[in-house]
């Protein structure tokens, strides 16, 4: 089972770096990190994204939001290749217990397609 950890970004800084580092440390090898950025103009954000995407295998694209949040989320979804998509805000960290057990939870509940 492959999970896509996906997020939309725009000018996040320290929280984005913490989240990427957390995901790299806690995701399984077959999982992916997917980021769609709304052309951040914050230099620190650009530096974080450039550095982390060059060090780690992160699927990254930039696309203008153009006041179309639904279109942005759909584009992000289409970038993902996992069996499940774990949508994150760039300023949140998933629980360590959840990261360790998410696949067991999903496998134990095969008829459920959405978790909140």
Please provide the spans of the model-predicted regions.
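Conserved donor NDP-sugar-binding/catalytic core segment of glycosyltransferases
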Residues: 93, 97-116
């Amino acid at each position: 089972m492959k999970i896509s950890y996906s997020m939309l970004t725009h000018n996040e800084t320290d929280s984005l770096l913490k989240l990427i580092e957390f995901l790299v440390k806690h995701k399984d090898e077959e999982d992916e990190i997917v980021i769609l950025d709304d052309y951040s103009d914050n230099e620190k954000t650009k530096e974080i994204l450039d550095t982390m995407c060059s060090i780690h295998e992160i699927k990254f694209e930039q696309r203008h939001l153009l006041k179309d949040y639904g279109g942005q989320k759909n584009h992000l979804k289409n970038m993902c290749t996992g069996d499940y998509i774990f949508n994150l805000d760039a300023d949140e960290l998933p629980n360590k217990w959840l990261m360790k057990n998410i696949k067991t939870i999903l496998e134990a509940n095969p008829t459920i397609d959405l978790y909140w």
